[in-house]
Amino acid sequence: MSQLLPVYDVIVVGAGHAGCEAACAAANLGSKTLLITLDMNKIAQMSCNPAMGGIAKGQIVREIDALGGGSGIVTDKSTIQFRMLNLSKGPAMWSPRAQCDRMIFSAEWRDRVEHTDNLDLWQDDVIELLLDKDRVTGVKTRLGISFSSRRVILTNGTFLNGLMHIGRVSFPGGRISEPATYGLSDQLKEYGFAVG
C-alpha cells in the first residue's frame, strides 16, 4: 500500500476467508480495492477446524480455485497433514482433506493480500455505511475516518453484534478473546436486515 485513495471502486469489510477472496478477486480484475479488518494479525484466521476439504467444503474450495481464488493455494502452502476421507465407502464419497497450520494459513493469506496489486489494507472497525439517498457511497470507521467507494462488500462473519455462549453464560464477542462490533449492525437492522 503506497497511499490511500480518495475514492475506491470496492471496499471489503472483514478479512476472513470470504473477505480475502472478495478483495483479491476485485483487485485482480482491476478494481481499486480497500480491505478493512479489525486485526491485521488475524487475516483469514481458521477459527474452528483448521481443515480445508471434505465433501462439502472441498467442493467450495475447488469452485473458488477454478475461478482464480486463493484458498486452495494458501491451503497447499500451509498443509501439515493430507488425508483421503471416506475410503471405506464408494468412490463417490471419497474426498481429500488438508489439515492446515492455523498460523501459517493466516500468514500466507496476509502475504497474498499485501502483495496483490490494486489492494490496500486498513485496520479499523467499520461502524457505519455512508449513504446518498438509497445508495451506499462508502464507510465510516470507529477512528472517525470515512472512505468513499462505488461498491461495499460486507463479509463480517460472526462479529456483527456478536454473542458467544459458554455453558449457560452469554457475553459479547466475535470469537474467543475478540470483541463484537457494534454500530453497523444497528444500521443494518434499521434497513430491515436480520442481524445476530
Please give the residue ranges for each predicted region.
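Beta1/beta-strand and adjacent pyrophosphate-binding region of the FAD-binding site
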Residues: L4-A18
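Short beta-strand segments that buttress and anchor functional surface loops
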Residues: G138-R142
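Conserved phosphate-binding elements of NTP-dependent enzyme cores
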Residues: V12, A23-A26, V136
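Redox-cofactor binding/interface segments in oxidoreductases and associated redox assembly factors
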Residues: V13, L154-T155
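Conserved acidic residues
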Residues: D9, T137, R150
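Conserved N-terminal/central alpha/beta ligand/cofactor-binding core
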Residues: Q3, V7, C24-E128, D132, ...
